[in-house]
């Protein structure tokens, strides 16, 4: 039996590898082929603390002050209203206290398994140095904002992660980077992938060693009786793990999935005086996260809802560069600019399961900001599902039929 996994971001690669290691014959279909998926441009943050779905009463109340036009990170481009308005209506419906509580319970369970799954993955691919488990920082520019932020995070459900006030030693290190930092907190139990390029190469090597065939090109799905087929590829079972491209692929089987492109932006500059061993730093009032990769430092942020194929907005990159100057960060240009589309569903939960419309179709997509974090555990869950093993987590709340 041959299983085709469509999508070569971290969710797709993790799924293909997990299946191959269980003895399955696997073909990985890479529709992009250029590492342009969100997996390869994110902050590298293993975000075990992000238990609360962004579809929440608090988020809805905060929308006006978060708008990009007012200096915030959230952009709802007027020319793309046809793309984001239906999504926004569904998000509002998913933001009731009851649905938020249910979603938090699901994410808490998934995120509790994220770090153990990452440990297993880096051991499997022979690259344990890729996983750093030394937490991350959140910093603020005033004492009042730091006190408010610390209180909010200490009252929040952070799952298996723990939050404490940053030590004086930590603050001294952070102030070398940005003298205006007035206060900060330090998370433990979260982590970082130290180098996304190294991760991509290590995954390709592991896939090859496991016998996975990688096919570059677009997957075209069609109906074949009670199941689905991919044009030009002989596969008995198909897993859709194509990020934002999953919406069109699922539509071929009759699923109408309200998946939207939640686009993020980053800039990368030379590391200069940024320490090699410093954990990622979130500047919460600027809604950005700063991560060192090898000799580069990446600054990432923004939530732009709209079409995946819309031209990038240069104002986002310009604002990130302005934040670097305003915070006096030791990151030197010229900056490399990148934009990618996070695949997001209105309740901010992923979709993982088996199709009710095609007997041989399975799916794993919609991980929003948590694609990198949840990729290894998602791959294991899908492998459980296809091998007939009861998944360690109840997947019913993640079925696409919830929409």
Question: Whereabouts are the PLM-identified features?
Answer:
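Beta1/beta-strand and adjacent pyrophosphate-binding region of the FAD-binding site
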Residues: 1-9
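N-terminal Rossmann-fold NAD(P) dinucleotide-binding loop
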Residues: 12-13
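Glycine-rich FAD pyrophosphate-binding loop
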Residues: 20-41
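Active-site substrate-recognition segment that forms the wall
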Residues: 44-45, 50, 54-94, 221-224, ...
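Rossmann-like flavin
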Residues: 85-205
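Flavin (FAD/FMN) cofactor-binding core of flavoprotein oxidoreductases
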Residues: 139-144, 164-173, 261-262, 270, ...
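A conserved short coil-to-beta-strand element within the FAD-binding core of flavoproteins
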Residues: 167-174, 192, 213-229
């Amino acid at each position: 039996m041959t299983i085709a996994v469509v999508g070569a971001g971290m969710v797709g690669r993790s799924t293909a590898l997990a299946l191959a290691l269980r003895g399955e014959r696997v073909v990985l279909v890479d529709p992009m082929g250029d590492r342009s998926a969100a997996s390869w441009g994110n902050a590298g943050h293993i975000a075990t603390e992000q238990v609360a779905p962004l579809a929440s009463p608090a988020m809805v109340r905060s929308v006006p002050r978060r708008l990009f036009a007012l200096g915030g990170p959230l952009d709802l481009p007027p020319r793309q209203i046809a793309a984001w308005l239906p999504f926004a209506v569904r998000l509002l419906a998913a933001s009731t206290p009851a649905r938020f509580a249910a979603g938090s319970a699901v994410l808490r369970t998934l995120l509790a398994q994220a770090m153990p799954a990452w440990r297993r993955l880096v051991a499997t691919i022979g690259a344990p140095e890729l996983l750093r488990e030394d937490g991350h920082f959140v910093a603020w520019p005033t004492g009042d904002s730091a006190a408010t932020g610390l209180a909010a995070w200490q009252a929040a459900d952070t799952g298996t992660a723990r939050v404490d006030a940053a030590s004086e030693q930590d603050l001294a290190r952070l102030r070398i980077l940005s003298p205006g930092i007035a206060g900060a907190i330090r998370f433990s139990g979260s982590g970082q992938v130290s180098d996304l390029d190294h991760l991509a190469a290590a995954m390709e090597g592991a896939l090859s060693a496991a016998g996975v065939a990688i096919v570059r090109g677009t997957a075209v799905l069609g109906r074949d009786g009670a199941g689905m087929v991919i044009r030009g590829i002989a596969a008995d079972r198909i897993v859709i793990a194509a990020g934002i491209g999953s919406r069109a692929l699922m539509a071929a089987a009759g699923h109408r999935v309200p998946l939207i492109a939640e686009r993020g932006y980053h800039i990368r500059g030379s590391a200069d005086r940024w320490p090699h061993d410093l954990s990622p730093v979130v500047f919460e009032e600027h809604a950005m996260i700063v991560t060192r990769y090898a000799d580069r430092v990446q600054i990432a942020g923004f939530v732009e809802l709209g079409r995946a194929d819309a031209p990038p907005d240069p104002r986002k990159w310009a604002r990130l560069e302005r934040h670097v100057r305003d915070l006096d960060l030791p990151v030197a240009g010229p900056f490399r600019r990148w934009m990618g589309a996070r695949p997001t569903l209105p309740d901010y939960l992923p979709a993982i399961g088996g199709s009710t419309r095609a007997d041989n179709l399975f799916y794993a997509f919609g991980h929003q900001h948590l694609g990198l974090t949840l990729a290894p555990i998602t791959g294991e869950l899908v492998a459980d599902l296809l091998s007939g093993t009861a998944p360690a987590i109840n997947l019913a709340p993640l079925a696409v039929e919830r929409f």
